[in-house]
A protein has these predicted regions:
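Functional cores that coordinate and move charged inorganic groups
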Residues: 145, 149-242
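C-terminal ends of transmembrane helices
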Residues: 6-10, 78-93, 142-153, 196-207, ...
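Predominantly late transmembrane helices and immediately cytosolic-facing juxtamembrane segments
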Residues: 1-15, 204, 208-218, 222, ...
Length: 390
């Protein structure tokens, strides 16, 4: 059964795995540059302002904000296409198949958040970062898994992919409900009107992307102005892309997913990693990691993630609610649970939102995310390597 299930998945896995390695290279380059004589150029370039628009209709944002607000909206558009496809015909379309990654993902979001809250309890400012260690970087985690090749059952790769996709859905909901600014009812109304037009296009059977793109571009602008984070526009747009097919033709959703995936994997996410992973390590010591923000993130990712995913998955299997992935052991599953602690790009993104008004914590976020993700990478890899030899 796994062989049949994995056919549409293998292309996606290879793409995400390769993307993870590119992300790693981008992050390393950012760290090297931000700690070299080019550091001033690096940070100043990210803070340069660019105006995009016509006359008074447009936005003037820093390079850093264009990356985090526009490029990440495209990323979330792509992620939502994946989620929609998975719920319609993929690993999440059958409740019995979906329960294990769903339950594991819930544990992987709740426990890290709890760990962070315990460490930062009593500080209202730093508590705002509670969601940072709840995210999983799907590309990076699958990239590490790919290094083990056939030694890891395909069922575990599917489990990790499904769990990370559900994690992304959780991140989308967290951004929408917890990290939005002061809301403008007038712009929210325009967002709603735009969305209604998109739904009408869907219901009318429009299968060309251009009409969706034009309305979606306006909706992104209205969303940014409304106070809701602009990435939510990508989510709303993707939710209206039709997935119905006639004959042997692919749906618009499938066509778009395949068309933009290389750009997301090898351009958008590496650019995001390069722009957000740079942090000065000058004066960094063990005491830096023991500050509440980086420590909460580090332990949330490295301890909270593996404990949450593993315990929730264990209970789900033992109570008969869900089934173990085919041809896998508990040690296999534990290794994958550890890899979910690779938060990297998603954790950095949530961190930027959480401390948008308190930027003094951003360096601590980067240190905690990088340290927690690195520990999860090394420990998870060696656990899986050891389990494959038994």
């Amino acid at each position: 059964m796994i062989n049949n299930l994995s056919k549409p998945f293998k292309w996606f896995f290879k793409l995400e795995a390769a993307s993870g390695l590119v992300l790693l290279i981008s992050a390393i380059i950012a760290l090297i540059i931000s700690n070299s004589y080019l550091s001033e150029l690096y940070f100043n370039t990210l803070e340069q302002y660019l105006f995009i628009g016509i006359n008074d209709f447009g936005l003037k944002l820093s390079v850093h904000h264009w990356i985090n607000d526009l490029l990440m909206a495209i990323f979330f558009f792509f992620v939502t296409l994946e989620i929609k496809r998975e719920f319609i015909q993929g690993e999440l379309s059958n409740l019995k198949k979906a329960l294990l990654p769903i339950i594991g993902a819930v544990g992987g979001m709740l426990v890290p958040a709890l760990v962070y809250i315990v460490i930062n309890f009593g500080d209202i400012e730093t508590l705002n970062g509670w969601a940072i260690p709840s995210a999983t970087d799907i590309a990076f985690s699958l990239g590490i898994l790919s290094l083990l090749g056939s030694r890891v059952p395909i069922s575990l790769k599917i489990f990790l992919t499904a769990l990370a996709i559900i994690d992304d859905l959780g991140a989308i909901l967290i951004i929408a409900f917890f990290y939005s600014g002061d809301l403008s009812l007038s712009y929210l109304s325009l967002v709603l009107i735009s969305y209604i037009f998109l739904v009408i296009l869907n219901k009318s059977g429009v299968k060309k992307f251009i009409p969706y793109l034009i309305i979606g571009a306006f909706m992104w602008f209205f969303t940014y102005k409304s106070g809701i984070h602009a990435t939510i526009a990508g989510v709303l747009l993707a939710s209206t892309i039709p997935h119905k097919v006639k004959g042997k033709d692919f749906s618009l959703l499938i066509k778009l997913e395949h068309a933009i995936s290389p750009y997301v994997a090898f351009m958008i996410m590496p650019i995001f990693a390069f722009a957000n992973a740079g942090v000065s390590l000058e004066g960094l010591s063990l005491l830096s990691l023991l500050q509440p923000v980086p420590l909460g993130i580090l332990l949330g990712l490295f301890v909270g993630k593996q404990v949450g995913v593993m315990i929730f998955s264990f209970v789900a299997v033992k109570t008969g609610m869900a089934q173990m992935p085919d041809n896998s052991s508990w040690l296999n599953l534990y290794g994958v649970s550890v890899l979910t602690g690779i938060g990297f790009t998603m954790s950095l993104f949530v961190g930027n939102l959480a401390f948008a008004e308190n930027i003094q914590y951003i360096d601590g976020v980067k240190i905690g995310v990088l340290a927690g993700s690195l520990l999860s990478t090394l420990f998870g890899y060696f656990i899986l390597l050891f389990s494959s030899k038994k």
